[in-house]
Amino acid sequence: AAISNATSTTSQQSTPMKDTEEANQGMAYLETVRSRTVTIYLPLLIFVFVLLFPFYWMVITSFKPNEELLSRDGNPFWIIQPTLSHFHKLIFETAYPEWLWNTVIVSTVATVVSLACSVLAAYAIERLRFKGSRQVGLGIFLAYLVPPSILFIPLAAIVFKLGLFDTRWALILTYPTFLIPFCTWLLMGYFRSIPYELEECALIDGATRFEILVKIILPLSVPGLISAGIFAFTLSWNEFIYALTFV
């Protein structure tokens, strides 16, 4: 009986302790949620709002009629009378489809040409180990830092002499002047991360340098090639000075 009474007393004492611990854990959880809300979620919400608001403004502006755009009385954050007249005018009353098609062709071809040249250049600099390869790599990086506006005048003279003004080839041939240095510099770092022992094993088995490049280096460099291709395509798409002058 004494043992049972002691057990019941101990259980009765442990029950309030458990309740207190659970209450403390609950309060700590609430404090954690509040701190996360203040320190993480609230700044993240503000960041997302600042990031997405320009796109929202762009979309609602494209659907507003001219009267609503110029009016000071309406709500600038909402559309009262949506319209598709702006899209109709852009597509059917301007040469926008042709401009878009030219941009796609020029950016795609320039990106492919630049990647092909950059792969060969980056592999030669990083793997062939000829005298002065590091200096060549540094020169390529410095060439990337040269602003396109400095190359504008000599490139314009070359394009004029070749008779390529107002053609797509004028941009396809000039865009690689700033795409190849960038892609080469980017791929040099990626090729450097690939173990050289893989190439040594392939050389022992009788593979040529071209076979090593195609069958070993390129498959392992797909993420780097994708990154370089995305950056090159973006730079080509956003370029304005050459496109405004040469075409």
Kindly give the residue locations of the regions a language model identified.
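Transmembrane alpha-helical segments of polytopic membrane transport and secretion proteins
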Residues: 1-45
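A structural signal for multi-pass alpha-helical bundles of membrane permease subunits
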Residues: 30-31, 36-247
